[in-house]
Amino acid sequence: MEAFSLLNYWKNSGGAVTFLPHSSESSSSSLCRYSAGESIGTTTIVTSVTETEDEEADENDDEGPFFDLEFALPAEEEDTDGGVGREGDSDCTDGGCEFKFTLSSCSGGEDRVDPDSLDDVFFKETIVEEVEPPTSSEQQTCSVKAPAAQLSASILKTATKLRVFMLGMKKSKLIQAKSEANFGSEDLDKQTHPPPPLSLSPESQQKSTVTVNLKVEEVPIISLFSRENSSKNSSSSSSSSSSSSSSLKKQNGNESVVSDEKRFVMMQKYLKKVKPLYIRVSRRYGEKLRHSGQLTAPSSARSTAEKADSPVATKTNNKPGNNINIPAGLKVVRKHLGKSRSSSSTATTPSSTTATVTTQSESRRRDDSLLQQQDSIQSAILHCKRSFNSSRDKDPSVLPRSVSEPSSYEK
């Protein structure tokens, strides 16, 4: 057994891979060449071809080639070994890039390929036939003698990052189910009806190459409902958080303002309802206090008002034919005013200047009270002196007693 490696990497749009022998006599080695177009990512495919030429295989007419495919991917490496009864995983993703490579088998001079040997490799996609012009006579004879089997293939790149479209899931599932059904029917047709031997015509040369369409796509892992750019996501998230916080603050401020306005309106309504009742109660209470007859003078305002009303009351009482009930408080005030010396002056003042008169009368009253005290003291002193002088003149024996006890006389 001889292992041959197929080196070269495909890029985005596709290319052709062809097994070409180095020499027809020395060995049956084949080299896989690949031509690639525009690319998105980078992926390396290493394919080894093993041809069996044992005696037992010749006796059993098992002349088909066996392919061992090994894929080295940038994200992760995965080996795919060709064996009987093993089927490689294959899916179709929406919006991928296509790769095309052509496999032409060189089995060393066999006229046909056993369809049973094709069970070693399974593919699922349509065939795209492509012809490469032979570069030498050896290659031409090899391609003529060894027609390739027509295989339907689609290989999914086993990368760790895949893009998922929610809207295209149903469509992709339906397409996959249809492709699997078509593949099963083609398999049965191949097993029951082997292909007829091909003639040496240009059509057979065209069918000697098989082109496989591959779709590979490299995308970053992102969530289904987020944007592809992380900076945009961060800026949008920060802006959304700031806008949400500002909106919450505005809502709280508006709610506080509305609550304050509601409170103010409620207080105004309450005061409007309570104010007339308060005024009525205060008026009634003032009238009761005025007509109760037990008024006292706790504050200067009430005392001044009573003093202002007292001259008018005295005038009305002095007039003949006026029988008016005067409260007891006013009577007391009138008595006090009658005793003072300034009662006459306050009685003659007009009622229009009651405020000024009351202040003047209070000051005069204080002055008069001081004068009265001084007069009484002076009169007492004079009385003592007179009595002392008169007693000394009348009775001289009192002198030593008065001299011995001067304090009694001073008192």
Swiss-Prot record:
The keyword Cell membrane applies. It comes from the Eukaryota. This is Probable membrane-associated kinase regulator 2. Residues 184-210, 227-259, 287-411 are annotated as: Disordered. Residues 231-247, 340-361 have a biased composition (Low complexity). It is found in: Cell membrane. Keywords: Cell membrane, Membrane. InterPro entries: MAKR2/5. GO terms for cellular component: plasma membrane. Residues 248-257, 293-303, 313-325 have a biased composition (Polar residues).
